[in-house]
Amino acid sequence: MEIKDQGAQMEPLLPTRNDEEAVVDRGGTRSILKTHFEKEDLEGHRTLFIGVHVPLGGRKSHRRHRHRGHKHRKRDRERDSGLEDGGESPSFDTPSQRVQFILGTEDDDEEHIPHDLFTELDEICWREGEDAEWRETARWLKFEEDVEDGGERWSKPYVATLSLHSLFELRSCILNGTVLLDMHANTLEEIADMVLDQQVSSGQLNEDVRHRVHEALMKQHHHQSQKKLTNRIPIVRSFADIGKKQSEPNSMDKNGQVVSPQSAPACAENKNDVSRENSTVDFSKGLGGQQKGHTSPCGMKQRLDKGPPHQQEREVDLHFMKKIPPGAEASNILVGELEFLDRTVVAFVRLSPAVLLQGLAEVPIPSRFLFILLGPLGKGQQYHEIGRSIATLMTDEVFHDVAYKAKDRNDLVSGIDEFLDQVTVLPPGEWDPSIRIEPPKNVPSQEKRKTPSLPNGTAAHGGPEQHGGHSGPELQRTGRIFGGLILDIKRKAPFFWSDFRDAFSLQCLASFLFLYCACMSPVITFGGLLGEATEGRISAIESLFGASMTGIAYSLFGGQPLTILGSTGPVLVFEKILFKFCKEYGLSYLSLRASIGLWTATLCIILVATDASSLVCYITRFTEEAFASLICIIFIYEALEKLFELSESYPINMHNDLELLTQYSCNCMEPHSPSNDTLKEWRESNISASDIIWGNLTVSECRSLHGEYVGRACGHGHPYVPDVLFWSVILFFSTVTMSATLKQFKTSRYFPTKVRSIVSDFAVFLTILCMVLIDYAIGIPSPKLQVPSVFKPTRDDRGWFVTPLGPNPWWTIIAAIIPALLCTILIFMDQQITAVIINRKEHKLKKGCGYHLDLLMVAVMLGVCSIMGLPWFVAATVLSITHVNSLKLESECSAPGEQPKFLGIREQRVTGLMIFILMGSSVFMTSILKFIPMPVLYGVFLYMGASSLKGIQLFDRIKLFWMPAKHQPDFIYLRHVPLRKVHLFTVIQMSCLGLLWIIKVSRAAIVFPMMVLALVFVRKLMDFLFTKRELSWLDDLMPESKKKKLEDAEKEEEQSMLAMEDEGTVQLPLEGHYRDDPSVINISDEMSKTAMWGNLLVTADNSKEKESRFPSKSSPS
């Protein structure tokens, strides 16, 4: 048989065509020179299994730029067609380059715009005494799902592993089979006629079996979700199914049955029933019904109706349809064995436009691709593997796009070759192909396969993706007074109304209820501590009022409403020092505090006017993590400390003698030696110790009259209290455990997705509610939340407004600027570091941030609170992180086995606004709030602190100290930074964290903001210990000097010029086919040299020779 050259065979046989006709690409049987193979080469071949590159989680928007390469493409085709026999394609024309060229082109119509694909594999099934039918055996959205043998259920999604032999056979099928691109057809029967006519005309199918093949293709399709109607009522039904049915659209008839589209008449003329934009499927036109349907969450509208009673009916799996993205199309793979065939029938069809082929696919979406493989008996498993191969290829992100944009079979073969060039081979002796690989949590991006890059095998020395930098336009200096503030207002104003509309979600309600309980306790506790430190001049009611007023104003007009304002430790330390100073020198505390607050507000406004917030760009991950870790640890420490302090109020007897229980008592007695203060109090209250019946007093009365407790059941100044401390410990740890368990309930396997999502969103609120009910039912008098019940200042000698001067000397107003400078640093650092953490790029915020506007609102409200004698409030790190975590958005339509993709944060103002409105109204809800046990709130604090530690890289690196290298996680920085450098970076960060902790818990806590600022300089000094590349992986790069930037820009320009010169260099092939870089290969050329490919070509030759002895009986159509 005459051997044809590769270039001629790869060229389409119909170079010109009418737009209304399908592109027919016949191809050839040989693409390389004839090769002889040794017997042992063929017999000793072993199957290699390939780990397929899994597709990207959600398909990104495809590039639509206009490529000016059509003329060049035409010229390349003419050049290829003019190659002499035996000529090779140029070495630089690799499949990867051709695929990148294909994906870079833009078509004039929308028919070649890639859509998401649902792929279904059907195999023809023959049973004795029954009519043959097509049975669904596997399906793909992102990962493979198989129908379990005999189980009548779907397998868990898994990553497909393919044999190299089946991929080669698939490539041969595309090369030698029938390829029909952009076929215009409306029914499966039309498609079958066109395919078989082409097969007969090309001599690939005998005319005498055409009719029988046509009948086989038109057999009924049976899907896994299809169930025949019976009179039997299922008795056993799982709760998950019940929940699933309740959560699904109820647009079906009362039985939940719809007509099997296979048995319904097809509408051949109306091809506009399929909408290309949102995949709207109109069943009423195909079935003649009038009943309207329901629009699914993914945008697919079904109009379903019942057919005649004698027709077989099937259920549409609406739960599975929710997982199909909007605009998705179907790819149908039909494979099987037919006893009357003596050779394989192969066809690849792309429809234009996509058509709803009723009954062909499991779900009612339009079909775009069909792959048909029918052959003689005895090769069923081989056909099945080829079908799995093409189905897996259709889920590959790159080949999927190539299939949509391909102009001929050459493009499809290039797509297969590019796929082969990217796969990973698993050794057959070290891997069991029956093992199903679990889908990965994070699917790698395939964008580098779509864009031109360095040659094969050449490592690209690129840097890491910068996720955490703060070099956005929000932090650019404007050089104008209030320039940054004006830009912040312009940036946030367009989103103001959407900040309220976007809050209509159950997730926001859950976040609001949770954070209200979480914010109430620290505000009241802070007010109580402040009341003790200031002798009641600022206490709980002032704290509640100040937090509510400041929070409402900030939530309405702040630049980043996701930030939650709260009280901080350094502020409390400052208040204590200031009160002690005023008491020693006889100054009015509230008046001097008002002067300091007004100066602080003024200085903060000056910082806003001069764009000082742009200095935030020097706060890198190193500083952020140290600060955030410290606040989280403080939350955990204080929660445990508060629980431990309960033992002082509710002591227990650790050494009981059970035999003396009848003698245990604790009585109130008159003090033996009352203090002078006690005697003075008795005289002022006209109380005589001899007139008091001390034995009849209650515990609180005895304490108020300064009596003494005497008896075996008395502790140090208190009577022993049974059960309360232990019950508080149980409530504390039960709250932590239940909150964490319910929060993770979203990833469990029980109940429908909607139920799991709601439980996870309301986890903390449900926990608090359950603990309150249990505590109320048990009846043990645990300590409860104490909320002021009257809205008035704590002390009667003060009002709601304070004059800055008051009784103090005039010079105190001027002197107040000195402590105001320290307060300004405190407010600026606390506010901006928290804002930086909230605005990190990992959170995918879309509405921008407003550092200048945030600082302005804090400054204004600080001045207002100073005049009204209320506490100062600034951004609370842990509460803000918790707020952001409670509003995370994930994709609703996710393929089976695919992890929901993080989409961003639900950015809105309502949750913060409602938290502080309700906080201000808490005075009127005392009768409800008094039932909340304090140990439950302490448990919430511990949970918040521990959950906020997740995602902090510092703690991941700390765990590496105790891990052997082979057991360490595959962190990206461990690939590029030596382990000793990673440990050195961690030790420095831990040392800084320890120093911050020492200062925070000591009397020097007022200088804590100064130490946080010092971390920026410590990070700058680390440039001498680490290279720039190492710091880019371990931390964010700090802004550099202008001179250094210019030098780097010049170097980059020189490198780009050299790269352009290299691209323009013409490389001439040398004698002996010498290759200057052995790592650069052409997968198509190398494949043609393999024994496996040669074996397939020998088989194809035999088929051709057999065909020549039995010529076709029909003429070409």
From Swiss-Prot:
The chain crosses the membrane at residues 509-529, 538-558, 562-582, 596-616, 626-646, 720-740, 762-782, 809-829, 855-875, 912-932, 935-955, 998-1018. Gene3D superfamilies: Helical hairpin bin, Mannitol-specific EII, Chain A. Residues 530-537, 583-595, 647-719, 783-808, 876-911, 956-997 are extracellular. It is found in: Basolateral cell membrane; Apical cell membrane; Cell projection, Dendrite; Cell projection, Axon. The modification Phosphoserine is found at residues 89, 275, 1056, 1084. GO terms for cellular component: apical dendrite; apical plasma membrane; axon terminus; basal dendrite; basolateral plasma membrane; CA3 pyramidal cell dendrite; dendrite; GABA-ergic synapse. One of its GO terms (molecular function) is sodium,bicarbonate:chloride antiporter activity. N-glycosylated. One of its GO terms (biological process) is regulation of pH. The N-terminal cytoplasmic domain is likely to have a high level of intrinsic disorder. This is Sodium-driven chloride bicarbonate exchanger. It comes from Rattus norvegicus. The lineage of its organism: Eukaryota, Metazoa, Chordata, Craniata, Vertebrata.
